[in-house]
Amino acid sequence: MKIKESSYLRRQKPLLRALVERLEKKYRYCSVLGADCHAKRYSVNASGVSAATDDLFTQRGFVVRVVDERGYAEYSFNQLSEAELSAVEAKLEATLDALAAALPAGSSYMERPLPPDEPLTFQGATECAVHPESLGDAEILERLTAVRKAGLAVDEKVIDCGAFVNYQEIHKLFLSPNRDLEQDLLW
């Protein structure tokens, strides 16, 4: 089965595309990176049984980047509405103004090459035989418990045996004036 696309990214994509279209009129370069990633970890050992969201690998939101003669600016957010498009533009503008104002007299922004933006479209998804979510926490923990018991049964000298599993479902979206890239994968 193919990993399904993120409904969160799908809902926000038209507004993100509109934001890129607005920003490309003002800046030499602009892009938006969106992420919707969910991770879970399971463990069974002598100290107990655990099924929990892995906060380190769970993320959701967007980062917009622009470049002009004043430098680079980035702004991150979790949701976007049509009413907020102008506010995002204003935040980027304020960041670039602050960068320019912070430069010492007589110095200027160090010119760097712009990120590549040749036309490219990509939509890819990994496939998996069984998605961990379809098993459910109870089934995963039951299987890990069986693995732990089998490990303990190998030899009476085995004091403890732990069984652990993590998974992360990753959804990414990258938009620029010439690029529309999406990936959905399970790791």
Positions of the model-derived regions?
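Active-site bordering "gate/hinge" segments
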Residues: 1-187
